Amino acid sequence: MMRGLLATALVCAANAPATAIELPPEIAKQRSIKVAIVPNYPPMEFRDPATNTLTGFDVELGEALGRKLGVKIAWQETSFDQTMPAIMTGRVDAILSGMTDLASRQDTATFVDYLRSGPRFFVQQSRAAEFKDTTALCGKAVGASRRTSFPKHIATWSDVHCDGNPIKFVGTEGSADARTQLKQGRVDAAVQGGETLPYLMDLEPGAYVPVGEVFAVQFTGLALGVKDKALQQAVVDALDGLIADGSYRTLLAKWKLTGYGVERATINAGQ
């Protein structure tokens, strides 16, 4: 009799779910999290040209976080300009869209940081011989999204390295626009997150070549409402869980982001 009871207890223990991460009551009730995304930044988030479905590192990370939390991720496509207003007004619970954690944004949102990243110069491969090192960029036209922190970082780098011959910054509507202007010869070089370049170089073989290394350290974060402390902690716990069980590293490797991973989740590490 005792042996049978013990066996039953062991089976029940084996089948019991892992300790659940505590969710805010409203999230626990609706069993979903509304997440804003701007799918135009491969490999972070984009629409698969063959299927028109959302894909990318952020999409797969978001779905993995949802499984850890036991909720559905309800993706809400929007423009970049509307992401912060959406989190402020509560139209979405989170933003997971390759967003840089900046101190200037932390009054509006709290960031759970999941990548260590930074801007990197690149040029057309056909002009690689002109740009053997980054100092060759001095005096040249360099394009980057005006909505990011890249303009500030480019100006800082130029001030330090281009005495009397500064980079001529050209603001673009986004990274895709910067690449278009690069191909058209309207800019000599472009800047975007270094984590995105390996994917782009695979997507368009022979098109681009990086110049130098990442020239500033940034963190990419999942943005949440400043007052949503319980959800912030839940996301931290879920991300740490993915890091611990190896799922996070698997996703990094799949999307060629291994060199940009973090060892643990942090909050508002951006400057």
Question: What residue spans do the PLM features occupy?
Answer:
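Short glycine-rich His-centered loop
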Residues: Q30-T55
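A ligand-binding cleft/hinge motif common to bilobed small-molecule-binding domains
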Residues: D81-P85, G98-Q106, H153-T156, Q181-K183, ...
